[in-house]
Amino acid sequence: MASQGTKRSYEQMETGGERQNATEIRASVGRMVGGIGRFYVQMCTELKLSDHEGRLIQNSITIERMVLSAFDERRNKYLEEHPSAGKDPKKTGGPIYRRRDGKWVRELILYDKEEIMRIWRQANNGEDATAGLTHLMIWHSNLNDTTYQRTRALVRTGMDPRMCSLMQGSTLPRRSGAAGAAVKGVGTMVMELIQMIKRGINDRNFWRGENGRRTRIAYERMCNILKGKFQTAAQRAMMDQVRESRNPGNAEIEDLIFLARSALILRGSVAHKSCLPACVYGLTVASGYDFEREGYSLIGIDPFKLLQNSQVFSLIRPNENPAHKSQLVWMACHSAAFEDLRVSNFIRGTKVVPRGQLATRGVQIASNENMETMDSCTLELRSRYWAIRTRSGGNTNQQRASAGQISVQPTFSVQRNLPFERATIMAAFTGNTEGRTSDMRTEIIRMMENARSEDVSFQGRGVFELSDEKATNPIVPSLDMSNEGSYFFGDNAEEYDN
């Protein structure tokens, strides 16, 4: 990529830093996760959680959500201006699960947001540490991506539900900054832009006045983020058209949907990073490990090593399968919801099955669920190998893929062919090449038709033994090329509802 020199690595985005060398990046990412860990340890002390309770992923999620809510300025301001019954804008809380007389009981806790912010800042050398907050948001986003399908959201914006492999990060808040933008899939960006354009169509003042000027700046910035994800000149040129449109409307929506479809074959660059639940960093900090001194990377071996040595528990409902619950969380930890299952399988070293075959619902427990029947299990989050997470979509070629999901978005930088369902995808492109973007559309369709199944992505890249920390001996897995590996294959995952 020609523009590589101007890009910050997403480790730098993650920590809000300017360009740094590798050691500085490792130190600042280490400082970030160390701060999360210290915060978690302190919260466990505040809440008097036992060791077992502190390792419960549901408790971790509640604590993470509390700190995110405490720092959500826009929502806090909104709550103060629009007081709703029963919501104290100055407080935050959630369910904490404790072990009492051999049973799990739910306790709803409430804390001052001020107090939570104080504890967070104290754990982060007195700073706001927005990078750490974004990191937690990305972990929640990865968990959502793995747990839910976004069919309804796709249909609502006029996209095809089978394009779910493009929807990484679709539940990330807009305030997640550059690190959040880096992990958003092409479909997510398209969806955000379409929602914006639709508001403009329905509300004539949307683009007008001082507010409209800010809206316009946000629109162009989102267009540029999406443009930066595309790897071909024609796709980028089409994004320029969309961005420069005087009055964005249905023509732009058409163009964006066209571009989203094209990304199923001409994949965009979407960053992947392993973001772990706060309790994992907490356990590591509590054991005396110094993240900042040792350094840390979100895309290397470090998260794998952490998960090899961490015991995390989860509440489990009566008819759920602990192995399946573990798979769900493992995939979320490595941001592998849209990765080819053949690759995930090889790295994890245990069978990774499609979402529809998992006997498990989401990790979080609804407030009306009966705690009497709840049990807990150990999550098996270890792996057989590790691999570097990719920020590119890989080059493109063609293979059989499944009914429910017709393409993948690679997570691991591992040599393989990238499956997609050519016939299904191309069927959507019939006779729609008129209008001002016709030459670009024609060019994009030509490239898609020429994508070949022999092409291999991530040539020579492999997985590594966990003892191979410096990544010196890549093992290129032999994947069954006849088999495809879509996770949301013909699926019945629950919808994500805000």
From Swiss-Prot:
Function: Encapsidates the negative strand viral RNA, protecting it from nucleases. The encapsidated genomic RNA is termed the ribonucleoprotein (RNP) and serves as template for transcription and replication. The RNP needs to be localized in the host nucleus to start an infectious cycle, but is too large to diffuse through the nuclear pore complex. NP comprises at least 2 nuclear localization signals that are responsible for the active RNP import into the nucleus through cellular importin alpha/beta pathway.
Keyword RNA-binding: yes
Subunit details: Homomultimerizes to form the nucleocapsid. May bind host exportin-1/XPO1. Binds to viral genomic RNA. Protein-RNA contacts are mediated by a combination of electrostatic interactions between positively charged residues and the phosphate backbone and planar interactions between aromatic side chains and bases.
Taxonomic lineage: Viruses, Riboviria, Orthornavirae, Negarnaviricota, Polyploviricotina
GO MF annotation: an example: structural molecule activity
Signal peptide positions (record): none
Region (Disordered): 1-21
Protein name: Nucleoprotein
